[in-house]
């Protein structure tokens, strides 16, 4: 009987954890993302743990597919269905590695979430600041939150001190493609090489 009781408790706890959803309010959503990241990035956590947890967070909170389409721009029209599937598969791996490798060396980042600016029904900008330390100045960070589905906001871009990371990535991808005479599949090689490092 006790065994059955503990199994039921375990299943209930597991269901509660899996069914956790971030807030639908863009500002609160970003606050929850920031708070969760702080817990992941404490000094006592290993780099492997940080990488795993940050990847899980990104898969839940970032519109990776949307970022992938934006990063490719009009070049996506040159891909057939199978090539697009391969690109999206590679981009997700590329994005997660790029995202986690930038953050795992941080420990206990202090970010204050400040205000929101509703651009239109699809986008809200959430403004925040990475507080200064003895070694680094404060950094202004704007989160571009995609709100087409109001029940599930997703991050589409980070704008750091006025520099859009998504736009920078789009320009880098375009440079690779243009260097290879417009051959989009050459970008696949670049993505594979980055993931394999």
Q: PLM ranges: what are they?
A:
Residues 5-13:
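Sec-dependent N-terminal signal peptides
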Residues 16-21:
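Sec/Tat signal peptide C-region and signal peptidase I cleavage site
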Residues 23-103:
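Early exported N-terminus immediately downstream of N-terminal targeting peptides
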Residues 71, 91, 115-117, 129-132, ...:
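A mature extracytoplasmic/lumenal domain signature
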Residues 97-139, 190, 194-197:
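Surface-exposed, charged secondary-structure patches
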Residues 138-167:
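Short beta-strand edge/turn micro-motifs at domain boundaries
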Residues 157-197:
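Low-complexity, intrinsically disordered terminal/linker segments enriched in charged
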């Amino acid at each position: 009987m006790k065994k059955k009781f503990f199994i039921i408790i375990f299943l209930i706890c597991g269901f509660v954890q899996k069914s956790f959803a971030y807030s639908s309010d863009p500002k609160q959503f970003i606050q929850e993302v920031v708070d969760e990241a702080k817990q992941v990035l404490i000094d006592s956590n290993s780099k492997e743990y940080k990488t795993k947890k940050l990847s899980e967070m990104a898969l839940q909170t970032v519109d990776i597919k949307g970022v992938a389409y934006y990063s490719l721009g009009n070049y996506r029209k040159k891909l057939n269905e199978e090539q697009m599937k391969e690109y999206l598969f590679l981009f997700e791996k590329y994005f997660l590695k790029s995202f986690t490798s930038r953050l795992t060396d941080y420990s206990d980042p202090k970010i204050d979430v400040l205000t929101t600016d509703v651009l239109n029904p699809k986008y809200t900008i959430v403004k925040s600041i990475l507080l200064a330390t003895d070694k680094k100045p404060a950094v202004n960070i704007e989160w571009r939150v995609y709100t087409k589905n109001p029940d599930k906001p997703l991050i589409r871009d980070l704008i750091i001190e006025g520099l859009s990371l998504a736009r920078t990535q789009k320009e880098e991808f375009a440079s690779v493609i243009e260097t290879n005479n417009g051959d989009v599949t050459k970008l696949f090689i670049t993505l594979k090489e980055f993931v394999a490092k």
